[in-house]
């Protein structure tokens, strides 16, 4: 057999039916659902008289619409109906649900891994763009639309076009203060938001190998922002250690057998990718987005680009539009940009590693008077663990708000929105126009960079913090 990439191996193992020049029918190992993209799918099953094909392979939680202050006080009628519908649908169709009373509730892409539902080698889908998060475990995970949600519920399969393979290799050693978020933002900034179109990415190299699972999830989460269908990292000892003793993971001898198979799941020597990119991690800086997509990003010590420095006419027009919407000017220093809001959370950066990183920045300091800062743990489990470690006290004493788990300010589908014309340093994954609220201005950053912005009221190079610590 020809040498194959891990992407091809997982794909081939799950093909139920294929035909020359046609999409493949893939078996889906895990289907994650939430309250926003599932109601129409369940209604479709009901109208057709169908059942959920594999309820044991389906897991639901509530995350997008729910409040993070008083989680039971859902004021928006549409949101309330969606939450109620999910409860009713899961009960009727026999699907496991982590509802608002459950200790397992949280953002779907946070709870899937922490419960041991996400495992290496699986095919995983969810009606959400950032399903690629689960690729951190060496799984093939991608977002699907509502009609596809119904198809998977009723058949446990999905028609998909075989993707091309893209290797992104990052070697070297990251500078102190440079994080997984900076790595993926740097990649997107260098190659654009469309370069991954038609590909599934495998992230390789020592930078990714040295990352924790939380950090790997941050990287894979933003694969979609590069235009890719999915992104993954081959499983290793770090992966296996994370999966051990998780609620739904195999136990005992079954786990040891599975772990041996997972460690063998990797790209063969001599396998050829359709395209490869190699980067030096030591050259990556803390990053800040300045425009209206994740590709409009620069090192924190840079200046907003002037139109004449942009090669394409379309790029110039996009930049001019971004200046206006974001309320910024060409040649303005990133570090001179002031913020009114800071959001630490989302499926990109709301795990323990992220919260510890932010808490390290703010310990003994105070949020600037001009800033409103909130921390939203990615799950009830993360919230509990953070409180056991005392992180919540660090945030509260600094002047942050400490919330319940949910998607929160990542998107304007709940009570947490950025007011029109105001600016937010956010650890989320999208800075599109209106993403955090009508007229909201979003700058994507790492948790450490967000924490520093909260303290100073403007962007600050987090590397200075570590330099000061070294001097002291």
Curated annotation (Swiss-Prot):
Which pathway, per its entry?
Amino-acid biosynthesis; L-leucine biosynthesis; L-leucine from 3-methyl-2-oxobutanoate: step 2/4
Q: Which SUPFAM superfamilies match?
A: Aconitase iron-sulfur domain
Single GO BP term: L-leucine biosynthetic process
Keywords annotated in UniProt: 4Fe-4S, Amino-acid biosynthesis, Branched-chain amino acid biosynthesis, Iron, Iron-sulfur, Leucine biosynthesis, Lyase, Metal-binding
Provide the residue positions that the database annotates as binding [4Fe-4S] cluster.
347, 407, 410
Any one GO MF annotation of this record? 4 iron, 4 sulfur cluster binding
Q: Which reaction does it catalyse?
A: (2R,3S)-3-isopropylmalate = (2S)-2-isopropylmalate
Q: What class of enzyme is it?
A: lyase
Q: Which cofactor does it need?
A: [4Fe-4S] cluster
Q: Which InterPro entries match?
A: 3-IsopropMal_deHydase_lsu, Acnase/IPM_dHydase_lsu_aba_1/3, Acoase/IPM_deHydtase_lsu_aba, Aconitase_4Fe-4S_BS, Aconitase_4Fe-4S_dom, IPM_dehydratase_rel_enz, IPMI_cat
Q: Copy out the cofactor comment.
A: Binds 1 [4Fe-4S] cluster per subunit.
Q: What is its EC number?
A: 4.2.1.33
Task: Write down the superkingdom of origin.
Answer: Bacteria
UniProt function note:
Catalyzes the isomerization between 2-isopropylmalate and 3-isopropylmalate, via the formation of 2-isopropylmaleate.
Q: Which PANTHER family match?
A: 3-ISOPROPYLMALATE DEHYDRATASE, HOMOACONITASE, MITOCHONDRIAL-RELATED
Q: Which NCBIfam families match?
A: leuC, PRK05478.1, PRK12466.1
Q: Which family does it belong to?
A: Belongs to the aconitase/IPM isomerase family. LeuC type 1 subfamily.
HAMAP family, A to Z: LeuC_type1 (MF_01026)
Q: How does it assemble?
A: Heterodimer of LeuC and LeuD.
Provide the protein name. 3-isopropylmalate dehydratase large subunit
Organism, as annotated: Bacillus velezensis (strain DSM 23117 / BGSC 10A6 / LMG 26770 / FZB42) (Bacillus amyloliquefaciens subsp. plantarum)
Which gene codes for it?
A: leuC
């Amino acid at each position: 057999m020809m040498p194959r990439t891990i992407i091809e191996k997982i794909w081939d193992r799950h093909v139920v039916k294929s035909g020359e020049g046609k999409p493949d029918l893939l078996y889906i190992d895990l289907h994650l659902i939430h309250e926003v993209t599932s109601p129409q799918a369940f209604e479709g099953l009901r109208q057709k008289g169908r059942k959920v094909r594999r309820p044991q392979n389906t897991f639901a939680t509530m995350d997008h619409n729910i409040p993070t202050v008083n989680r039971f006080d859902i004021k928006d009628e549409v949101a309330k109906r969606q939450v109620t519908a999910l409860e009713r649908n899961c009960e009727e169709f026999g699907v496991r649900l982590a509802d608002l009373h459950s200790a397992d509730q949280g953002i779907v892409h946070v709870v899937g891994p922490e419960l041991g539902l996400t495992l290496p080698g699986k095919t995983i889908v969810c009606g959400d763009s950032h399903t690629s998060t689960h690729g951190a475990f060496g799984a093939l995970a991608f977002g699907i639309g509502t009609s596809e949600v119904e198809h998977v519920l009723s058949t446990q399969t999905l028609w998909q076009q075989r993707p091309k393979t893209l290797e992104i290799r990052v070697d070297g050693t990251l500078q102190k203060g440079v994080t997984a978020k900076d790595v993926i933002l740097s990649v997107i900034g260098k190659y654009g938001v469309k370069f991954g179109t038609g590909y599934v990415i495998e992230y390789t190299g020592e930078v990714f190998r040295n990352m924790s699972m939380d950090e790997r999830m941050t990287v894979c989460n933003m694969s979609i922002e590069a235009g890719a269908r999915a992104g993954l990292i081959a499983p290793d000892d770090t992966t296996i250690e994370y999966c051990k003793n998780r609620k739904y993971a195999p136990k005992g001898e079954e786990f040891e057998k599975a772990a041996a198979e997972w460690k063998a799941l990797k790209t063969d020597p001599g396998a050829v990718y359709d395209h490869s990119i190699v980067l030096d991690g030591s050259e990556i800086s803390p990053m800040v987005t300045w425009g209206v997509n994740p590709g409009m990003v620069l090192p924190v010590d840079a200046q907003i680009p002037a139109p004449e420095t942009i090669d394409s006419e379309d790029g110039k027009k996009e930049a001019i539009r971004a200046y206006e919407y974001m309320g910024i000017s060409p040649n303005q220093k990133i570090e001179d940009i002031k913020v009114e809001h800071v959001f630490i959370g989302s499926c990109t950066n709301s795990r323990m590693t992220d919260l510890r990183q932010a808490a390290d920045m703010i310990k003994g300091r105070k949020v600037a008077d001009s800033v409103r800062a909130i921390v939203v743990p990615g799950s009830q489990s993360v919230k509990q663990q953070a409180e056991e470690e005392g992180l919540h006290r660090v945030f509260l004493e600094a002047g942050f708000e400490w919330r319940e788990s949910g998607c929160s300010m990542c998107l304007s589908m709940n009570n947490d929105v950025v007011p029109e014309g105001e600016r937010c340093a956010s650890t989320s994954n999208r800075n599109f126009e209106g993403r955090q609220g009508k007229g909201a201005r979003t700058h994507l950053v790492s948790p450490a960079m967000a924490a520093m912005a909260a303290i100073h009221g403007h962007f600050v190079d987090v590397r200075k913090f570590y330099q000061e610590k070294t001097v002291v």
